[in-house]
Amino acid sequence: MKIDILTLFPEMFSPLEHSIVGKAREKGLLDIQYHNFRENAEKARHVDDEPYGGGQGMLLRAQPIFDSFDAIEKKNPRVILLDPAGKQFDQAYAEDLAQEEELIFICGHYEGYDERIKTLVTDEISLGDYVLTGGELAAMTMIDATVRLIPEVIGKESSHQDDSFSSGLLEYPQYTRPYDYRGMVVPDVLMSGHHEKIRQWRLYESLKKTYERRPDLLEHYQLTVEEEKMLAEIKENKE
């Protein structure tokens, strides 16, 4: 996968040199290039200006973004604008982006964008219902969530299939050694070696956590007969 990032602050992306994303780059599975669009600004390197019609704040000018975009070697990229008014990013969106060969992220700053910049864009995406100073942190979050889904980046596909949201449910509790730590012990079922009972316990705990913390996820989740029975028991125990 090739990712190009248009930003005023390339140095903010140093975390992408480490961990899973960094390893993907080392393996040659990922190429990330940064483009400081201030370098393409014509008016004394000014990238922003006052909005027509008045109003508070400054807008990113179209010219530096367009010229930086035109300079990128590309074929058929997915172009993502980080915008609080965009569609909310989620695991399904990450899975969709992971299928692409080319991504371009446009990271804004200031009050907003000249609307004409959006003619370059295929996707306007937001992390959530809050406003960040710029798009850089949002872009890094989306890149991390997307890159880890690329085949061969993590290794076993099952490593991320059990993650929260990948299955549609929140992830079940997990434990490692020692068995007893400060009086907190590992559930006996996980020590039993009985694979079917362990599967049932994990499914029950996933449903329980999802029902308690993110019941909205269950509105779009297709329950199996087994899951319906478990969820009914969970609700009954909560009453």
From Swiss-Prot:
Q: What is this protein called?
A: tRNA (guanine-N(1)-)-methyltransferase
Which InterPro entries does the record match to this protein?
Alpha/beta_knot_MTases, tRNA_m1G_MeTrfase_C_sf, tRNA_m1G_MeTrfase_TrmD, tRNA_m1G_MTases_N, tRNA_MeTrfase_TRMD/TRM10
- GO biological process terms held by the UniProt record: tRNA N1-guanine methylation
Q: Does the keyword Membrane apply?
A: no
Q: Which organism is it from?
A: Streptococcus pneumoniae serotype 4 (strain ATCC BAA-334 / TIGR4)
Origin superkingdom? Bacteria
Q: State the protein's purpose.
A: Specifically methylates guanosine-37 in various tRNAs.
Similarity-based family: Belongs to the RNA methyltransferase TrmD family.
Please state the Enzyme Commission number of this protein.
2.1.1.228
Keywords, comma-separated and alphabetical: Cytoplasm, Methyltransferase, S-adenosyl-L-methionine, Transferase, tRNA processing
Instruction: Quote the record's binding site residues for S-adenosyl-L-methionine.
Output: 108, 127-132
What subcellular compartments does it reside in? Cytoplasm
| PANTHER family assigned to the protein according to its UniProt record, in alphabetical order | TRNA (GUANINE-N(1)-)-METHYLTRANSFERASE
Q: Please provide one cellular component term from the Gene Ontology annotations of this protein.
A: cytosol
What Pfam families does the record tag this protein with? tRNA_m1G_MT (PF01746)
Known catalytic reactions: guanosine(37) in tRNA + S-adenosyl-L-methionine = N(1)-methylguanosine(37) in tRNA + S-adenosyl-L-homocysteine + H(+)
Q: How does it assemble?
A: Homodimer.
